[in-house]
Amino acid sequence: TLARLLQGAGAALVPALAIALLPLLYPRRAWEVAGLYMAGNVLGGGLGRVLAGVLAEGLGVREALLFLSLPALALGLLLLGLPRGKTPPLGPARYDLRALPLYAVGAVLLFLNLFLANLLPYRLLDLGYRPAEVGLVYLAYLFGLPGSALSGFLAARLGPRRTFRLAFLGVLVALGLLLLPPPFLVAGFVLLMAFLFTAQSLASGAAGQRGPGVSGTYVASFYLGGTLAGLAYPLFLHSFPLAVGLGAALALLALLLAPVEAQ
């Protein structure tokens, strides 16, 4: 239990520091680099899930966890060996109450992701999909790659606030498709993942530009949204349209908040 707690703390600390460092390392391309960073997160998360299943079946659960921890250990040792002058100072952590809308949007982003992704298998099984077919639907997460990578490109040209609003308009369209029969339902989930990761990249980039205090609080709010999703989704197992309605209300709230600012 202690090891799992430490693992979770480390998993939250790394992105908080990373998104705070990006504007310092790449001041002229902060939005683009933040988008690429989030695309890497999507790819790594997807590969981790796939490899975990394959390795656990072939080697065992403990051996799979050990194998997957080796790249993180190697990167940690590499970072320890870097000269101190290569890393710009972050400065003191400042906690800005004006960033409350940003924290709220962070919570909404992961809530929508996990809340609907956890409910989708039950909906698909009710519609007659086989378990193997349900598993393939989760390849939709791969569409978060172009969504994340394009977010910085669009933010640099349209402005981050406008791009953020466009992303959540796309989320609302995707939620509407979830209420339709297949194949529209599957297309809606694909679009949902793409637009959620677009918005997530922009929100992460905005948090990073405000310093380590804001970026750390943003990451904490993000994971809090995921925790709430895990607690809430069992209440909607047989009420998928109602769950989509809740998701639409939260997406509309995020659209109205639009906390991403050009800096």
Where does each model-flagged region fall?
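Helix-loop-helix hairpin linking two adjacent transmembrane segments in secondary transporters
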Residues: R28, G35-P83
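Extracytoplasmic gate region of multi-pass secondary transporters
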Residues: A99-S148
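Cytoplasmic helix-loop-helix junction between adjacent transmembrane helices
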Residues: A3-N41
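Juxtamembrane intracellular "pre-TM" segments in multi-pass secondary transporters
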Residues: L82-V105
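A late C-terminal transmembrane helix in Major Facilitator Superfamily
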Residues: R210-F240, G247
